[in-house]
């Protein structure tokens, strides 16, 4: 893909796209390169394979930042705790799942005290940058680094918060601006009349559609709520909404294409 418009169309077509790849989802970077991508070396130098590539006259990094800030696409970590672009076509489904985990009783069960405080602070502020969030919560000391960033990742993995890199940072400062799911998606989300179990089933189908072919034993590692998804998966197989062959599951779209 050579233009930003093509990349945006690709994300909307797949609904879920991995930012860097290395998992079952189609990859943003592989789509840009036109071939599967793995870093050629460890550390920062491994990213140089693609970091300098230009798309529509802009660097891949700049295009990625533009895309995650769009009104119809966001980037979170709901899939395998890795950076994932999510089309607004999927937001009504994810919204039902996020709302389930926003329930006070559920939140207290799944989140630590620090995660609850971070979420409350982001809810109160509406939008807040990482450094200011740390200052507000008095977590600026170095010994809090790991715990703080791990907590942010966990909240992203549940879809409860969404971050975008600050487009106008101060010199040498790279930091996300955080919002709750509700704030980030409120303008264009739409509302689906789905139960929690129905939303889980639809998300699983969409994920397998995007991935085409997956190992069944990997599904429990996909989402933070994977323990709730087993019954939905079994029913989808019975209904023919997803297909099974040995240890693999694949999209029913494959059958439709071949029929």
Where are these regions (language model features)?
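Long, low-complexity intrinsically disordered regions
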Residues: 1-259
């Amino acid at each position: 893909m050579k233009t930003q418009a093509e990349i945006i169309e690709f994300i909307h077509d797949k609904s879920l796209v991995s930012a860097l790849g290395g998992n079952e989802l189609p990859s943003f970077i592989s789509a840009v390169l036109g071939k599967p991508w793995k870093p050629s070396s460890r550390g920062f130098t491994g990213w140089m394979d693609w970091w300098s590539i230009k798309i529509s006259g802009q660097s891949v990094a700049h295009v990625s930042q533009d895309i995650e800030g769009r009104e119809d696409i966001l980037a979170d970590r709901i899939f395998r705790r890795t950076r994932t672009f999510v089309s607004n076509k999927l937001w009504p489904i994810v919204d039902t799942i996020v709302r389930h985990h926003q329930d006070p009783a559920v939140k207290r069960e799944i989140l630590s005290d620090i995660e609850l405080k971070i979420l409350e602070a982001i809810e109160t502020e509406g939008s807040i940058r990482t450094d200011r969030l740390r200052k507000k919560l008095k977590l600026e000391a170095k010994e809090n680094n790991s715990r703080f960033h791990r907590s942010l990742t966990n909240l992203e993995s549940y879809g409860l918060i969404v971050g975008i890199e600050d487009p106008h940072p101060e010199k040498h400062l790279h930091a996300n601006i955080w919002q709750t799911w509700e704030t980030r998606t409120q303008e264009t989300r739409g509302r689906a009349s789905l139960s929690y179990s129905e939303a889980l089933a639809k998300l699983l189908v969409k994920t397998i559609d995007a991935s085409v072919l997956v190992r069944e034993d990997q599904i429990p590692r996909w989402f933070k709520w994977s323990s709730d998804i087993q019954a939905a998966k079994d029913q989808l197989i019975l209904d023919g909404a997803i297909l099974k062959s040995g240890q693999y599951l694949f999209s029913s779209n494959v059958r439709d294409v071949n029929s």
